[in-house]
Amino acid sequence: GKSGIYQIGYGKQGRIIEAAISNKTNCVGVDISCDKFLTKQLLDIQNIPVAEGRKVFNIIGLLREAEFIGYPVVIKPQYGNKGKGVMLNLKNEKELIKAYTSLLKITKDIIIEKYVKGNDYRICVVDYKVVAASLRVVPFVI
């Protein structure tokens, strides 16, 4: 429904899920999943590929990092979900500064990463098993 809360299964085998969090998700998992930078670090430590980039604290750091990793880039809030505030495929300094200025109105905790072209999949795992997967498609007009 509109609340974003779903039930998978029934009775004692059933699970309640909101976004990516189920009634079986522990607090540490929730905290990690809400922090994109921490999630990125933990994935990297486990040798799971992540986009090159880091947290930035000001526009000078932002521009230096963009120059280092190369355009196009992505900027996004460190905390959040559902793609809110994520600005993709910024191709030059002008686009980056405009996006950064806009994002600063929402948060000062900002991550910049190399833009990697490809598909965006959302995977739902319950009890260490994949129970659902979806391809996320950005809204568009035909």
PLM features: what roles do these ranges have?
Residues 1:
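Flexible, glycine/charged-enriched surface loops at secondary-structure junctions
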Residues 4-9:
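Short polybasic amphipathic segments
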Residues 11-13:
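N-terminal flexible segment immediately upstream of the FAD-binding catalytic core
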Residues 15-142:
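Active-site nucleotide/adenylate-binding loops and adjacent lid/helix of ATP-dependent enzymes
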